[in-house]
Amino acid sequence: MITMPHLKSGKNVKLLFVAVLALTILTTLLLTTDPRCALTSQTADTIITPTGSFDNYRLSMNRNGNWRHLSPTQTASLSRLGRVLYLDEDPPAARNRTFLILVWKYGYTTHDRHMKQYSDKEVDPFARCAVKNCVVTYEDAAAARADMVILHLHRTENVEDMPPVRRPEQIWAFSTDESPTHTFLNGQHNFNAYNGLFNWSMHYRMDSDIPVPYGRTVAKRRIDNDRSFDFSAWLTNRSNTSPIAVMGSNCGSQNHRWEYVAELRKWIDVDFYGGCGTLECPGHFTKDCPKLAAYRFYLAFENSNCDEYITEKLWWNAYAKDAIPIVMGGAPSRRNYAQLLPPHSYINVDDFASPRDLAFYLHYLLDAPDRLAEYFQWRRYFEVRNEHGYFQTPSYHYCRACEALNYNDLTTKKTYTDLLGHWSEQTHCAAGWDMVQGD
């Protein structure tokens, strides 16, 4: 509260009036000459009541996965493994047998990631797994014996690239870590040619038969009151120059993310690392970029806006570095992020009319430490896990495949007769940011 001094004379009143008038004129000049201070009414509303307030989630937090607020349709689309991962259901008992998993033809291309985690030694892919009754092989000669064949769509050249033999009870699972925009590495394919081939899907979405997201949010079994986040230390250790970092090596994208960054930089400082920027730092899968830990915010901008497509850019470059992620990607964006990330742990570009309005909100947070600290309250209730295998983090791909063989229904034969209905750019992706419409 501001208290006014006691005024004893008319002279003091005049002096106070002059001072207030001068301050008003100076403030007006600043607001009209510095574009970073040209606060719009819409931005002001955003600042007063920011979306995704943590308080809105307190009463709905529980330990059974309902905090995601999945729709009945979404819940029905989950496999048994999906219900374990996303609804926190107890898994069934492991089956009393050993399964052989063949990674067809291109297993070696991801060996360093899933079997070494980009380290200098082999790791057991089932070391952290709830089940261990599986064997993984790259030997294509095992195609006739394998219980499951994993087929990497990204590397597949055409439909003739499939195994030549197949047992009736064998499960073929198509696998991809890319969005539908970049499903195939070798140009466009006729998706209809693959109809009727695959029994299971293996990708990052919740509705996959074998969900393999880049990371996951897990509700803690009990509220963590003992280890609160040291916000004061965090604030002290962050960069006092540029508050935001971004890193990119793929300089092309269909969602115009780099155009958005260019516009954002007109209103707030952003340090740009990687081949698309001017600053150098390792950090492309194999080597980490420790410099990112010096920033308050990280632009976790994906290369396409597709359903649930949230990569290591967010899980590792932001959350693992204790930076607040500013997100662009998943579509429909607000629902995707709200169901997959801790509440009030991120800032969504779709909540702002333009990069300028986003910048104003970030300036506001930088000047309001109490509001900035609210973006870390989720840590008492949730934890985030990196599960992608980059930067020597655990890879759960083969573990999830083994869990699916143990948990999912093996008695009912499932077949994807319409692959495009499950996986297509037209159905599962959205248009990117438009500079004309977005500002």
Task: Give the residues covered by each predicted segment.
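Catalytic toxin/effector domains delivered as secreted proteins or via bacterial secretion systems
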Residues: 178-181
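Pol beta-like nucleotidyltransferase catalytic core
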Residues: 5-150, 155-174, 185, 189-315, ...
